[in-house]
A protein has these predicted regions:
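C-terminal motif of bacterial Sec signal peptides marking the signal peptidase cleavage site
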Residues: 4-7
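Bacterial signal peptide processing site
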Residues: 9-11
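Short, surface-exposed interaction patches in beta-rich subdomains
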Residues: 18-29, 50-52, 56-95, 133, ...
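Post-signal-peptide N-terminal segment of Sec-exported extracytoplasmic proteins
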Residues: 27-53
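A structural feature that tracks compact, well-ordered secondary-structure segments
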Residues: 37-39, 112-115, 122-123, 166, ...
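Surface-exposed, polar helix/loop patches in the mature regions of secreted/periplasmic/lumenal proteins
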Residues: 88-121
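Right-handed parallel beta-helix
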Residues: 112-141
Length: 225
């Protein structure tokens, strides 16, 4: 069960409903690896490392949308963390929904993110990430994996309408497949080889990162740095 800290802030939202804030912490409970599943209908999502246990989170949300639901279970040595908006949330004024999630940097993570609309910033280069699966309906998604990778990764990003920017570490061996529907694919620090983008790692490669990006309508930015 997640350890909860009660909401500490309530304000009026200028006629569109009460805005509340809540902070929560989740203990690792001895898990050796964790599957993290995030479901956000609309809003702004920020994810990064920095948690002492499994997760420290700060939520801002409209009261009428309901408090974000957090559930964590451990089976054997594998943990499963679910963070989601209640199913009855509304879509308008999604700027009132803001989640900041800080994750443990040392436990191996498989992360799945599903967003309906909004903006996501996933700064996960300092975590022990193995798999990342991102699906966004409409909006902007920024994924930053720069730093010193701790192992091989598989990354999948699927977008409907909007922009996706993916920053990748030049110390890793990169193998990227990107397909845009209606829009442009921009690549920096990468060489195009057939229908793929690759790099020449600086020094001995720390890891191999496989990336698959599929965009609907919008821009795809691939940056190796």
């Amino acid at each position: 069960m997640a350890l909860l800290t009660p909401a500490c802030y309530v304000s009026s939202d200028g006629g569109s409903g009460t805005v509340e804030q809540d902070s929560r912490s989740v203990d690792l409970k001895g898990a050796k690896s964790v599957q993290v599943q995030i479901e956000m209908g609309a809003g702004e999502l920020v994810m990064r490392g920095g948690a002492a246990q499994l997760m420290d989170a700060d939520f801002r949300y409209r009261a009428r949308d309901g408090k974000p639901e957090v559930q964590y279970d451990v089976t054997g040595s594998r943990g499963t963390l679910n963070v989601r908006q209640p199913s009855h949330h509304s879509i308008g004024n999604n700027d009132k929904n803001h989640w900041e999630l800080r994750l443990n940097e040392d436990v191996p993570l498989d992360i799945s993110v599903k967003m309906g609309a909004g903006e996501g910033r996933l700064e996960l280069g300092n975590t022990t990430l193995h798999n990342l699966d991102v699906e966004v309906g409409a909006g902007e998604m920024k994924v930053d994996l720069t730093g010193h990778p701790r192992g091989n990764m598989d990354v999948r990003v699927r977008g409907g309408v909007g922009e996706a920017t993916i920053r990748l570490p030049k110390r890793a061996r990169l193998d990227i497949e990107a397909h845009g529907g209606i829009g442009e694919i921009s690549a920096r620090g990468l060489d195009k080889r057939g229908d793929r983008w690759m790099n020449e790692p600086s020094g001995e490669a720390d890891a191999t990162i496989h990336v698959s990006v599929n965009g609907g309508i919008g821009q795809i930015n691939l940056i190796c740095e």
